[in-house]
């Protein structure tokens, strides 16, 4: 059987959603104080782990994060992140970003083609894995700290573990 708790440790949350939750957590830059989640397997009879998950995270300074993830969607789509903030909203998907300020100002950008390298992967997977791996190797070769430290990586891993602890009701 593929997709087991023993071998993979989880499904959509640990494999796919972790990246978006990590990015949103980085934007929020605060300590999570409560996590509510619900995980289930709705569409994959050949795996036992989660293929659907949603949750709500509350942070110390008052920010909140809502997330929804699934890997039983009918087609492959880019990830979307939407931020609603005091002074406006931000939207990111694939290689596009847009900020709409409350005063009507709009900033938008599209990742330049020279910055996007997929290395034979599917384009909706994104391209940051390659950059992070290259930075890690460069940090080892040049005896410096990587852009993303182990300490930062541990923070998101602990948050993902808390999502699993609070959300595995359907798997008990």
Give the predicted meaning of each segment.
Residues 1-46:
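Predominantly a Rossmann-like dinucleotide-binding segment in NAD(P)-dependent oxidoreductases
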Residues 18-22, 127-134, 151-158:
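A structural signal for well-ordered alpha-helical segments within the folded catalytic domains
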Residues 60, 135-172:
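C-terminal helix-rich "cap/oligomerization" subdomain common to oxidoreductases
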Residues 45-50, 60-131:
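NAD(P)-dinucleotide binding in Rossmann-like oxidoreductases
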Residues 19-23, 31, 51, 79, ...:
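Internal, well-ordered alpha-helical segments in soluble enzyme and binding-protein domains
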Residues 55-57:
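Short beta-strand scaffold segments in enzyme catalytic cores
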Residues 9-11, 120-124, 142-146:
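Active-site rim elements
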Residues 27-31, 86-90, 163-170:
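Phosphate/oxyanion-binding loops and surfaces in catalytic or ligand/nucleic-acid-binding neighborhoods
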